[in-house]
Amino acid sequence: MIENGGNDMALQFILGSARSGKTDFIYDQMIKDSMEHEDEEFFFIVPDQSTLNAQKQLVTRHPRHGTFNIDVVGFFRLTYRVFEELSYIPKDLLEDEGKSMVIRKIMEQHKEELKVFASSMKKQGFIDELKSFFAEVYQYDVSMEDLKKITDGMKEEGLRSKMEDILLVMENFEDYIKERYLISEQLLDVLAQKVERSEKLKNATFYLDGFTGFTPIQRKVLEKLLKIGKNVYVGLTLDGRYVRSQY
C-alpha cells in the first residue's frame, strides 16, 4: 500500500495473471466495502466495452443482487457522469465518419503541398490508417511540438517527408475542429481538467479492473482521482511468468 501525501487516501495494486482469482478478489472486496460503508460512493472502472458484463457480474455476486452504491463505468461513461454533474456541455463529438470526411477534405485542399500522400489518399484504408495514427497521438498525449522535434531529427528523407505530410494534415485537422468539435480521444483530457470539481467523486473509492496498462491520458485522470478519492485499487492482469499474484 502506498500512502499519498498527508491524507488517508491509499493506492493499492492488485496484480495477477489471467484466471488467478484477482478479479474475484476485487469483486468480493468491493462488495464488502460498499456494504460496510453504505453512505459512501464506489466506482468500478473497467474498459468501456466491458461495463455491461461487469454490471451483470456485480448483480449476480452481490448478496442483495443489485449495484446500490457502486457505479460501474468505463472512462468515457465516467467522463459524461462528471460533465452531467457539473452541467458542462462539451462541444459536439466528431464521429468516426466525420473524421474521415474532414481528413479527406484537408488532403484535397492541400494536395499540392503534400510530398508523399497526394497519390495515396484515394487508396482503400489509407484514411483509416491516418485516423489510427491521430488517435494514438492523442491517447498517448503526444503534442505537435513533440512530433515536430521527432520529424526534425529524422535522417532518412523518405520517412521525413511522410512525417511532414502527417504534420501538415494533423495541424489543419486540429485547426478545423478546435472551435467546433471534440473527438473521442480528447474527452479524457477534458475530464482530467474538470474532475477535481466533482463533489460526487470526492472521497469516493475507486476500483479498476480489466486493464493490462494505461495510456498517458488515462494515467493523467488516475492522478486526479488519487488527489480527490478516498482509496484507489487497481487490478492489473500481467503475464504469469513475471508476477506472482498479490492480494
Q: What function would you assign to each model-found segment?
A:
Residues I2-L93:
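P-loop NTPase Walker
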Residues M9, D39-E41, L201-A204, G229-N231:
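A general structural motif
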Residues M9-L11, G158-S161, D165, Q246-Y247:
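Active-site cores of enzymes that catalyze phosphoryl transfer or operate on phosphate-rich substrates
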Residues S20, F214-T215, Y242:
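Catalytic P-loop NTPase motifs of RecA-like helicase/translocase cores
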Residues F44-V46, V72, Y207, N231-L236:
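Structural recognition of the conserved hydrophobic beta-strand(s) that form the central parallel beta-sheet
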Residues S50-T51, V59-K200, P216:
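Basic/charged alpha-beta structural segments of nucleotide/phosphate-handling enzymes
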Residues K202-F214:
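Conserved P-loop NTPase "ATPase switch" module shared by AAA+ and STAND
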Residues Q218-Y247:
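Conserved RecA-like helicase ATPase core segment
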